[in-house]
């Protein structure tokens, strides 16, 4: 009703204010610190997300309000919450992982410029083969050290525990369940979250084996 509409308007106003501050901050600190804000609010007020819930309601026979209540904690479960501090800490970890191999990266300048243009203009997912942990650290180190938008990555929900889970969630990792075939609300939330990130030009990285 009117209360929901007022809440939505307040959310949009606050989001626009935060966006303006975020753009100004990135102009000072760099593109690497571009992080998504108000993701859950953006999903909840998304016409596409609400339409998908209505369609699921018709399919399952469950009320939309019930599906909406189920979706709320699932958003908290899957949505990463990156911050500048943890992006810096993750960059240090990436460099440490490279220490025993090749401390400095060799980068093709022309391809780097091409990648920068792609990330700026298109929804992007960077795919890599996951043979060692350094493979996963390579894309995130590359984008951080060259002031490109941070990469959201994927990890199994079994890794989301205590200090490690919080560290990686705050540096852009999306923890997903290993199996969710019979969990339609979870699938809907995850699908729309990923679509939201890509639409906002937040790139993803994903291992083929994942």
What are these regions, as identified by a protein language model?
Residues 1-210:
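Membrane-interfacial terminal anchoring regions of lipid-handling membrane enzymes
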